[in-house]
Amino acid sequence: MFELKKGALFVDEMKNVSIRIGKVVEEEEEVWEEAGPTPKPGILELRKWDHKLLERYEPFYAPMQDFCNLCTMGPCDLSMNKRGACGIDLKTAKARLVTIACCIGASAHTAHARHLVDHLIEEFGEDFPIDLGGDVNVEAPIIRTVVGIKPKTLGDLREALNWAEKEIVKVLHSTHIGNEESLLDYESKAMHVSMADHVGMEVADIAQIVAYNFPKAEPDTPLVDTGFGIVDKSKPTIVVVGHNVMYARPVADYLEEMGRIDDFELAGLCCTAHDMTRYNAKAKIFGPISYQLRVIRAGIPDVMISDEQCIRADLLEACKKMGIPLIATSDAAARGLPDVSDWPVEKIVDALVSGKLPGVFLPIPEKVGQVAPLVAEAIFKKHGGERKYKFFESDEALMEEINKCTQCMNCVFTCPHSLRVDQGMAHAQKTGDLSKLAQLEEQCLACMKCEQACPKNIKIINVIMRANYDRLYNKTGKTRVGRGPIQDTEIRKVGQPIVFGQIPGVIAAVGCINFPDEMKSIREILEEFLKRRYIVVTSGCHAMDIGMIKDEEGKTLYEKYPGNFDAGGLVNTGSCVANSHIAGAAIKIANIFAMRPLRGNYAEIADYVLNRVGAVGFSWGPYSHKAASIATGFNRLGVPVVVGPHGTKYRRAYIGKPWKKDKWWVYDIKSRQKVFIEPAPDSLLVAVETKEEAIVQLARLCIRPNDTNQGRQIKLTHYIELHQKYYGDLPDDWAVYVRSEADLPLKMRDQLLKVLEEQYGWKIDWDKKKIVEGPVRHFDAGFNPTIVEEVYEKYAGEKAPR
């Protein structure tokens, strides 16, 4: 370490000298933890860890096409083991596409973080302190583990962002034609850039929590209105859409300052809605991206404010058709609108209200806060609320639209879910009964592909929404406001039962709305685990989706289950960027419970999570590039992820091969031996077709090598019971997870011992009811697994065995 001394520099006689003062170091840096081996890692520093994962969980590719057209030497046919003009083969080409997708996702969150941090530093100063509440002492666990710094101020977050941005550029460079030729190294780069994505997310959410005073790790946050029919149509309605709350916040501030917050409806779509409710609990949530056209076509907004990410690319066109003024705010989506930053507020309001301009680009948050309420009130006075919640002017107009249909089935062929719109139309034409059309609404993504394909230009979405209007309007519920990080005290309480298996697992429901069936399936899947005392954490679109679905008693899951991070708890961390707190919780278990150091120590922490923390990510409706990078970042951390059937379109899965016995081993620090183990977890990324398959996979992937007898018994009980419930028999692979008779579910022990003896050839001592021979390995209470040689050497004090 260096010693700081006072000194002087005389510059009065210097010529042609430029002096720049960077970060001023006032005192020696606090040594909060010894630095690990990989602070601010580059592409290569964690490559060895990635290759260990990829050796066990081999990439499986499901290309949507067998050609490449990424450069002008193409398109190149890569089928039948052919190579392209640049020499690339099909698998490597798909690995490159996956890497590009992860780069896009990571850049979205990191650019969001950069925009937010720079703005907040300008507003609050770079010395504004990071305070996440008295119960969070291990703040920024991802930044600590990856970047190796302990951020104390907003200014410190720039250091983490500088690292993330550099790595994103380096990985994106590798995808240029004529670079990488190894699919495994592309996958390693995808993992690397996705880890940077997690850093970007953590920076963004920490910044907005501390600057905007969002809830700070509070389990019992307010419940807010969620769903289509949430707004009072007798009030002017301001609708925000996107993922950056920077531009929506001033609207709430302006209304509060004017004492008029109760005279307006302030509601949102997508993650800006989440973060608006974290800032002001009077805000409301319409829903995810699939509700954007629903809300616009119903004429609900009197003004719309768009920022960035997951917003329809025809938003302006859709708003123009309904006479809804649009204020675009983000440089990521200026939407071809004129920049009115220099205009006075009155001129902007007049241009929008008069219809001279259908929309404006206004990247100044404070002006947005003033303009939006004035425009909304003026537009509302024009129609008096009469246009709200109307898809057609009359029933006759609805039937006139339905009668245009000739059942050509173009809509069916283009629909992502192949919904039988033709049958619903035909039934309505013959009988006047809209029930078959109404049934389609629950599964409709409102993507508009059907309308594009229709030769009669039928407003199919309007028809479907109007057919199910009563149910759609009343599909309202409650979402618990995003709480942000998990408390250290919560981690301290659940760390041991999670690692030992007494809490059977953590299910992290994160992702988009591209569901294969009705939205209620996400509730059914998650409630199965809540009832079984798993911890369920959620964020983003999934978090708001489950706030819309009620049970027979009229309650949502948020109203039935507590918000604390404990067995049977349902935790909403917040928006997309709040996903970071879910990964952060896994990291904090390793640190707070197991005392593993975090600083620049990524591989050891990920190794700990893989072998001990029974957490599984779940994205039932994956759709975006951000979802791809979020999932891949979890994979690098050792957390498996289950995706719905549309997840196959990401083109790649990480699936282990249990029959390859030589792939399933660990170093046991206690016995100083290389030990062959059960395949747990046996996949890092896997797609499922049905909700039944999703439930069973999630339960199975919570099993970890480090489970105690009691923990394995609990996990096997749930796995077997769920398989029997949904498939009617025992799972094919249950026996590989049995290490001793104590692992077996108590009420089925005798039955299962008999099955092991008769069907699997195991030797059973029936007098003692003990397993004598058969398991892959026997249970050892001191078992201490790792797959990282350096971790073994660190704790065993010797070279790893061969």
Curated annotation (Swiss-Prot):
Transmembrane segments: none annotated. Residues 395-424, 435-464 form the 4Fe-4S ferredoxin-type domain. GO terms for biological process: acetyl-CoA metabolic process; response to hydrogen peroxide. [4Fe-4S] cluster 2 binds at C68, C71, C76, C86. It comes from the Archaea. [4Fe-4S] cluster 4 binds at C415, C444, C447, C450. It is an enzyme of class 1 (oxidoreductase). Binds 6 [4Fe-4S] clusters per heterotetramer. Binds 2 [Ni-4Fe-4S] clusters per heterotetramer. It catalyses: CO + 2 oxidized [2Fe-2S]-[ferredoxin] + H2O = 2 reduced [2Fe-2S]-[ferredoxin] + CO2 + 2 H(+). InterPro entries: 4Fe4S_Fe-S-bd, 4Fe4S_Fe_S_CS, CdhA, HCP/CODH, Prismane-like_a/b-sand, Prismane-like_sf. GO terms for molecular function: 4 iron, 4 sulfur cluster binding; anaerobic carbon-monoxide dehydrogenase activity; hydroxylamine reductase activity; iron ion binding; nickel cation binding; peroxidase activity. Keywords: 4Fe-4S, Iron, Iron-sulfur, Metal-binding, Nickel, Oxidoreductase, Repeat. [Ni-4Fe-4S] cluster binds at H243, C271, C310, C512, C541, C576. Pfam families: Fer4_8 (PF13183), Prismane (PF03063). Belongs to the Ni-containing carbon monoxide dehydrogenase family. Part of the ACDS complex that catalyzes the reversible cleavage of acetyl-CoA, allowing autotrophic growth from CO(2). The alpha-epsilon subcomponent functions as a carbon monoxide dehydrogenase. Cluster B is an all-cysteinyl-liganded 4Fe-4S cluster; cluster C is a mixed Ni-Fe-S cluster which is the active site of CO oxidation. Cluster D is also an all-cysteinyl-liganded 4Fe-4S cluster that bridges the two subunits of the CODH dimer. Contains two additional 4Fe-4S clusters, dubbed E and F, that probably transport electrons from ferredoxin to the B cluster. This is Acetyl-CoA decarbonylase/synthase complex subunit alpha 1. It comes from Archaeoglobus fulgidus (strain ATCC 49558 / DSM 4304 / JCM 9628 / NBRC 100126 / VC-16).
